[in-house]
Amino acid sequence: MALKVVSFPGDLAAVSFLDSNRGGAFNQLKVDLPFQTRDRRAVSLRRTCCSMQQAPPPAWPGRAVVEPGRRSWDGPKPISIVGSTGSIGTQTLDIVAENPDKFRVVALAAGSNVTLLADQVKTFKPKLVAVRNESLVDELKEALADCDWKPEIIPGEQGVIEVARHPDAVTVVTGIVGCAGLKPTVAAIEAGKDIALANKETLIAGGPFVLPLAQKHKVKILPADSEHSAIFQCIQGLPEGALRRIILTASGGAFRDWPVDKLKEVKVADALKHPNWNMGKKITVDSATLFNKGLEVIEAHYLFGAEYDDIEIVIHPQSIIHSMIETQDSSVLAQLGWPDMRIPILYTMSWPDRIYCSEVTWPRLDLCKLGSLTFKAPDNVKYPSMDLAYAAGRAGGTMTGVLSAANEKAVELFIDEKIGYLDIFKVVELTCDAHRNELVTRPSLEEIIHYDLWAREYAASLQPSTGLSPVPV
């Protein structure tokens, strides 16, 4: 059910997290949640402060150029996979299975699916295996009892970190969801491994810490999600300063054709009906709210160094154009393909090379059969997440991680039917508001993890019975 907000604390009404210039859509959304007014003077001061912050070095500053002398890998490239039993991990292993002459697995880490992990060990014969849930180590050993191949097994978080920095690995595929993937990614960077990045939190929460670290260790961060891979492919070989604008495409999610006034009636089952992609519950809800796209705006800023004013979102219902860039001469470059995550994952593993894919398992795009491609501007009233994401991005520092963690908790509460669909936006805004006075512009890894946990706890404390006011625990 939707949560009725009776009133807010007076100081919260005076100083809101959202920028009034971009957050006005909230005031037009007629639902059970009254949204407060914005203090323009506070916004102006925030922008002045934010503009003085030194941004971390982007992974790819508007262009991607292969360094002179770089050669293709001779023989199967050794890789580690963190999160091997999840969606990214299993698709990565599908790629390895199809290309044994190009890739080999040296280490695997999983959370708790030891049955699938054991099957993966038997098939790919890694040297090292980790299971994050330490209580399942004996079960994994039992599942491998009749296996001729006996890898080293290290349990717990330390095991996942050891997989990430395995000495034989050249590239590490990071497929763990949430801040749990941050420490292994940092360990891989410190060990000099290139990162096939499928964990959004690495940059959204950890960007201010991770990017300088990657620069220090001369590590490549290669985006494995479809939108950022599309941008990465489009900027290959661009001259310095040629990038003018980034255009992220979005399907629009389950409610792209719903009228705004019907959103207060949304049920969990409605939000889990994605029109194009088959994904997990959390990311499917994020597609419905467009929070996934808001988070991708932040990730694009960190990856490519574009200002937030130069990153746009366009609704593209067919999900064939995965994203676009505009160059200084007004040319627009796009990357097209069927909605298939294997393509961007493969490119992170093979870059800068292109690997042949059989059309038997990788259907080729037929534009004539496809027909028309359509586009429309996103509705800020229907998708308040965009205003929240842009505001968090401009605030920078720990605010982007707080936004991501609060959204993750809010979606969990929604899926568990503890809050309504529209309450997701309010929980995120209130959590970001509460973090304003504690924002750290250049956080350490410990501070990033601390505020991730804090945001989840604060979001969970916003109870219906108190009108979304925090409940002390």
UniProtKB/Swiss-Prot annotation:
Pathway it works in: Isoprenoid biosynthesis; isopentenyl diphosphate biosynthesis via DXP pathway; isopentenyl diphosphate from 1-deoxy-D-xylulose 5-phosphate: step 1/6
Alphabetically ordered keywords of this record: Chloroplast, Isoprene biosynthesis, Manganese, Metal-binding, NADP, Oxidoreductase, Plastid, Transit peptide
Keyword Oxidoreductase among UniProt keywords: yes
InterPro entries tied to this protein: DXP_reductoisomerase, DXP_reductoisomerase_C, DXP_reductoisomerase_N, DXPR_C, DXPR_C_sf, NAD(P)-bd_dom_sf
Targeting presequence: 1-49
BP GO annotations: isopentenyl diphosphate biosynthetic process, methylerythritol 4-phosphate pathway involved in terpenoid biosynthetic process
Binding residues annotated for 1-deoxy-D-xylulose 5-phosphate, in chain numbering: 200, 226-227, 251, 274, 287, 292-293, 296
Residues annotated as binding NADPH: 85-88, 111, 113, 199, 201, 280
Origin superkingdom: Eukaryota
Cofactor: Mn(2+); Mg(2+)
Database matches in Gene3D superfamilies: 1.10.1740.10, NAD(P)-binding Rossmann-like Domain
Catalytic activity: 2-C-methyl-D-erythritol 4-phosphate + NADP(+) = 1-deoxy-D-xylulose 5-phosphate + NADPH + H(+)
Listed GO MF terms: 1-deoxy-D-xylulose-5-phosphate reductoisomerase activity; manganese ion binding; NADPH binding
Chain sites annotated for binding Mn(2+): 225, 227, 296
Enzyme superclass (EC): oxidoreductase
Enzyme Commission code(s) on record: 1.1.1.267
Function: Enzyme of the plastid non-mevalonate pathway for isoprenoid biosynthesis that catalyzes the NADPH-dependent rearrangement and reduction of 1-deoxy-D-xylulose-5-phosphate (DXP) to 2-C-methyl-D-erythritol 4-phosphate (MEP). Required for chloroplast development.
PANTHER family hit by this protein: 1-DEOXY-D-XYLULOSE 5-PHOSPHATE REDUCTOISOMERASE, 1-DEOXY-D-XYLULOSE 5-PHOSPHATE REDUCTOISOMERASE, CHLOROPLASTIC
Identification of the protein by name: 1-deoxy-D-xylulose 5-phosphate reductoisomerase, chloroplastic
Native species: Oryza sativa subsp. japonica
Gene: DXR
